[in-house]
UniProtKB/Swiss-Prot annotation:
The modification 3-methylthioaspartic acid is found at D89. GO terms for cellular component: small ribosomal subunit. Keywords: Methylation, Ribonucleoprotein, Ribosomal protein, RNA-binding, rRNA-binding, tRNA-binding. This is Small ribosomal subunit protein uS12. It comes from Corynebacterium glutamicum (strain ATCC 13032 / DSM 20300 / JCM 1318 / BCRC 11384 / CCUG 27702 / LMG 3730 / NBRC 12168 / NCIMB 10025 / NRRL B-2784 / 534). Gene3D superfamilies: Nucleic acid-binding proteins (2.40.50.140). The keyword Ribosomal protein applies. SUPFAM superfamilies: Nucleic acid-binding proteins. GO terms for molecular function: rRNA binding; structural constituent of ribosome; tRNA binding. GO terms for biological process: translation.
Length: 122
């Protein structure tokens, strides 16, 4: 515990809150290039093959981003738009790819929640 004299000299400083989406550098989304597209398994108790892409962002940082929806057209060197939002059962995946933007196609035959998956009407 500091003495009053030490507090007079230095004072106390607040800890700044850690940002959940640091790689976006304050932007709502960032563009990036896929360096690897792969599937991975979620942690217990879930079981699946989740689609994930390793993306090098324009900020220079490389992150893992989840590819939402059923089916995708992404491969290495695809240009993607990345937004924040973690996937609870995939450790280390704190970003999602925006469907229907840049090289990412929207989800085919999607009827509900279309805007989230870049699906056109009809």
């Amino acid at each position: 515990m500091p003495t009053i004299q030490q507090l007079v000299r230095k004072g106390r400083h607040d800890k700044s809150a850690k940002v959940a989406t640091a790689a976006l550098k304050g932007s709502p989304q960032r563009r990036g290039v896929c360096t690897r597209v792969y599937t991975t398994t979620p942690k217990k108790p879930n079981s699946a093959l989740r689609k994930v892409a390793r993306v090098r962002l324009t900020s220079g940082i490389e992150v893992s981003a989840y590819i939402p929806g059923e089916g995708h057209n992404l491969q290495e060197h695809s240009m993607v738009l990345v937004r924040g939002g973690r996937v609870k059962d995939l450790p280390g995946v704190r970003y999602k790819i925006v469907r229907g933007a840049l090289d990412t196609q929207g989800v085919k035959d999607r009827k509900q929640a279309r805007s989230r998956y870049g699906a056109k009407r009809g």
